[in-house]
């Protein structure tokens, strides 16, 4: 859609900027959930480690 005028060019540029912002935003959200999940796994392992066959006082 070349030659569509200044308004079309501005819309195209704004669309590209928005696309980059959304991609960066979702990448950040993904990293946040990833680290949140790892933290939750670590907490569960510390709290319930004996249930998962880790070191436990049972059977000693």
Curated annotation (Swiss-Prot):
Keywords: Bacteriochlorophyll, Chlorophyll, Chlorosome, Chromophore, Electron transport, Formylation, Magnesium, Metal-binding, Photosynthesis, Transport. It holds the Pfam family Bac_chlorC. A bacteriochlorophyll c binds at residue 25. GO terms for biological process: photosynthesis. The modification N-formylmethionine is found at residue 1. One of its GO terms (molecular function) is bacteriochlorophyll binding. It is found in: Chlorosome, Chlorosome envelope. Its main location: other. InterPro entries: Bchl_c-bd, Bchl_C-bd_sf. One of its GO terms (cellular component) is chlorosome envelope. Component of the photosynthetic apparatus. The light harvesting B740 complex binds bacteriochlorophyll c. Belongs to the BChl C/E-binding protein family. This is Bacteriochlorophyll c-binding protein. It comes from Pelodictyon luteolum. The lineage of its organism: Bacteria, Pseudomonadati, Chlorobiota, Chlorobiia, Chlorobiales.
